[in-house]
């Protein structure tokens, strides 16, 4: 990782905060160790760095490196989503859908998923399509499923398509089967 002596100085300087927000959780933990990583991420998030808000929110949601705090995670995702981060918009939708740190609000979840999908987040597109399909808007759902699958890395694409093979709507199952047949890895994978 190189010489990271600068990390042990005040986190208020913007370039330091940006450098920290660009690190993965594992890199932060390695560079700073445990609580220091969380402190630096909190400082970066408080300075308004969207990536730090997103990263801190994920850590708080999962309890990775910090005690799980879904209310605080929700607040981080709300801030990052307000900064235009598509992944945070999707995660905010998950919070609304599942009641993580906030009251369950299906309409707010749908709006967050739509924003994430429109911003290019493949998970947001998938989640928005699931909401549309549940509401009976199959044509719209299929368009968003297609966009989500097209934008996903191969492992996520395969996971999404395999899950959709069990969807209650026949048209969605057919879409998933066609998608799996066109994936070179899926068509040669005998264990699936």
Explain the meaning of each model-derived region.
Residues 51, 55-64, 71-103, 107, ...:
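Alpha-helical adaptor scaffolds
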Residues 13-15, 29, 33, 46-49, ...:
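Short helix-capping/linker turns of helical repeat alpha-solenoids
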Residues 42-44, 78-80, 114-116, 147-148:
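Canonical positions in the second alpha-helix
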Residues 54-55, 90-91, 106, 123-128, ...:
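Alpha-solenoid helical repeat scaffolds
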Residues 30-39, 67-76, 103-112, 135-144, ...:
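Structural signature of tandem alpha-helical TPR/SEL1-like repeats
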Residues 111, 117-118, 133-156, 177-185:
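TPR/TPR-like (Sel1-like) alpha-helical repeat modules
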Residues 22-29, 55-62, 93-98, 127-134, ...:
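Hydrophobic face of amphipathic alpha-helices that form TPR/SEL1-like repeat modules
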Residues 4, 152-192:
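Terminal, low-structured helical/coil segments at or just beyond the last alpha-helical repeat
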